[in-house]
Regions:
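Domain-level signal for Mg2+-assisted phosphodiester chemistry and nucleotide/NA-binding surfaces
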Residues: 1-95
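Nuclease catalytic cores that cleave nucleic-acid phosphodiester bonds
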Residues: 67-162
Length: 162
């Protein structure tokens, strides 16, 4: 009987990709993490009653620096009074402002351009289309909301257990 249980445990073992493989694509990523926040991530965080900075620390453990581009801020301003609370959260002094040099660019395109040129970010979004586009860039982790908690995808030795 002892042999049968050992064989079963061997069958259940799943090979994981070593975290060193991840850093072949992105050696610039390390604590304190810089999290590039999207418009809908702020909205979903408010709907799920998750405090952004504390939720990121709970997910990743080390210190995190949430970053927001001027394109995302302008997108929140354009959405009108319905999103004024999200705009107030985005203007929090704990958020690092990233100035954009381009004019009139869609916020998702701005985020993709930024992560392609500087691979030191984790992208926080709940937008399926943007998540698909970020997955095409090697070495960029994703943060999203699932079951009223932040989750991280494609980060070696992930933060909080599920």
């Amino acid at each position: 009987m002892a042999q049968a249980s050992k064989e079963e445990s061997k069958k259940r073992h799943k090979e994981l990709a070593p975290s060193s493989m991840f850093f072949q694509h992105n050696a610039a990523l390390g604590p304190p993490y810089r999290v590039l926040v999207d418009t809908n991530f702020i909205n979903f965080s408010l709907q799920n009653k998750i405090e952004l900075v504390q939720g990121m620390i709970d997910c990743l453990y080390p210190k995190t620096n949430p970053c927001i581009t001027t394109c995302v801020l302008s997108e929140l301003e354009k959405l009108g009074p319905k999103y004024r609370i999200a705009l107030r959260v985005a203007r929090d002094p704990r958020f690092e402002r990233l100035e954009c040099t381009h004019k009139g660019t869609y916020a998702d395109d701005c985020i993709i351009e930024r992560i392609k040129s500087h691979k030191c970010y984790i992208v926080a979004t709940c937008d399926r289309e943007l998540r698909r586009r970020v997955r095409q860039v090697p070495g960029i982790p994703l943060m999203y909301i699932a079951r009223h908690r932040y989750r991280i995808e494609r980060l070696p030795d992930q933060g909080a257990p599920t």
